[in-house]
């Protein structure tokens, strides 16, 4: 990913859970979750799914290309019943399956990436902000030697 006037660039690499192909030739990127659906997950996982969608629509050489991706979402299994097989090598989950749509907003994702790459292009990091979650993560990582 490159932006004019920004020296830093990036590429996206990762492992998505699954994709769907629709009858009209479009695709969806799906992330599986074994938990109770939570509206906060939309924002939390939305950027990850947007990154997968961007990478699939703009692949590098010899990489999988799926385009256009028109839907993103989380497919939840909210386990209610868990049964262990007699040999304890098999587990069966029972529960409710829920689909949560995540809006595909490529312009928001690219705006985020432009901000990240602008920041990475600075000669020195800016002073940390008390309201910056990334700054808090960085401080915590340094505190624990990461």
Where are the regions that the model predicts?
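Short acidic/polar capping segments at secondary-structure boundaries
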Residues: 34-36, 79-80
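A generic fold-level signal
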Residues: 11-13, 44, 127
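An active-site-proximal "capping" alpha-helix that borders the catalytic cofactor pocket
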Residues: 45-59
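Catalytic cores of nuclease domains that cleave nucleic-acid phosphodiester backbones
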Residues: 1-29, 35-37, 61-70
């Amino acid at each position: 990913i490159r932006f004019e006037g920004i020296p830093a660039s990036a590429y996206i690499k990762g492992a998505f859970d699954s994709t769907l192909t629709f009858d009209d030739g479009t695709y969806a990127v799906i992330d599986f979750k074994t938990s109770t659906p939570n509206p906060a997950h939309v924002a939390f996982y939305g950027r990850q799914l947007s990154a997968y969608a961007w990478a699939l629509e703009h692949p590098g050489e010899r990489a999988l290309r799926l385009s256009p991706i028109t839907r993103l979402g989380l497919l939840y299994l909210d386990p209610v019943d868990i049964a262990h097989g007699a040999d304890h090598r098999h587990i069966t989950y029972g529960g409710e399956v829920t689909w949560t749509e995540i809006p595909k907003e490529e312009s928001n994702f690219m705006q985020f990436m432009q901000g990240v790459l602008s920041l990475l292009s600075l000669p020195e990091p800016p002073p940390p902000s008390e309201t910056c979650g990334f700054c808090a993560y960085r401080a915590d990582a340094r505190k624990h030697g990461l």
